[in-house]
Amino acid sequence: MRFNVVLFMLIVALLGGLSTCSSEVPIGFDTDELSFDMSLVLLTGDMQTKASDPNYTYATTEELTIQNCHVAVFDKDGKRIYFKNFYSKDLGEMKTIGNLSGYELQLEGVRTFGKEDKKVSVLVVANANNANNSPFDNLTTYDGVDNSYTAKTIAKGPVTASLLVKIGKSETTLKYNQDNAPVTVSLIQLSAKIEYTGVYKKENGELLEGFSLTKVAGLNASSKITIFNTSAVENGAFSDLAYPTTKPVTFYTYEISDAFKEVILSVQSGVEPKEYPFPANKFIKGNYYRIKGLKSSTEIEWVLENVEDKEVTLDPFE
């Protein structure tokens, strides 16, 4: 099921000031009257766990949070013509827009280098920036071998619910000297969410006390953002991440295609914890999973449940 963080809106109508932005101007262009202001509507899907917010079936407020955001605009050839970074001080407080939670932002002065209608693409990567800078600022194109977004690896473990990386893209046509409609960008969680629910008696489903999750190892802390090229796994990046005993029973991992990688749960019910492996390639971006044990008299059978089995597919840039 999709980590569709259901209809979480980010209507982009600038709060100004300390965010960073850049319009990248080709040599020889007259920049007078060749720019637009753009408003964005960011939609995030529902991540599946009971939430206090009545407008979301599962996602918690933390899982919907955006603490920073990188927005890039590309021309029809995939060359970046503009980017802007937003941080928490620029985003302001999450607010209600319609009956949904969101933020208001705006892109100012997007130069499109000509007065004819311009088709552009917008890419949004949320919660992937560093404290005071973005790993995307020096990139120049959407696709390619070097200095491109599709070649970029996000080396950041999705450790906390409030910093889950979200990504989305959209296309629009900008019309010169007109009010342009807000651009809608649907965001998806780049990680999968996993919840350990405990060990139960197999015969009657009764929760057994005395079993505790002490560690989770083998989680993927790195991902590329090439998820728009095809619905297949393309991240090709892996960085081992382990949750110590102080972490909760809900955790997150980026998708990985390597069939030999394993997510390993250490569960204690006596003096020594026992390790239980799960194939890491079973955990797909934008999905929510529950893991539970069913104990018979001799062994524990582990069940991996996809809360709602919906494929996450995203169209490529045209």
Curated annotation (Swiss-Prot):
Keywords, alphabetical: Fimbrium, Signal
InterPro entries noted in UniProt: Fim1F_C (IPR055058), FimA_N (IPR029141)
Entry's localization field: Fimbrium
Prosequence residues removed at maturation: 25-50
Signal peptide as annotated in the record: 1-24
Ranges that cross the membrane: none
GO cellular component: pilus
Summary of subunit composition and partner proteins: May be part of the fimbrial tip.
Protein's job: Putative component of the fimbrium tip. Fimbriae are filamentous appendages on the cell surface that mediate cell adhesion and biofilm formation.
Family: Belongs to the bacteroidetes fimbrillin superfamily. FimA/Mfa1 family.
Protein's name in the database: Putative fimbrium tip subunit Fim1F
Organism of this sequence: Parabacteroides distasonis (strain ATCC 8503 / DSM 20701 / CIP 104284 / JCM 5825 / NCTC 11152)
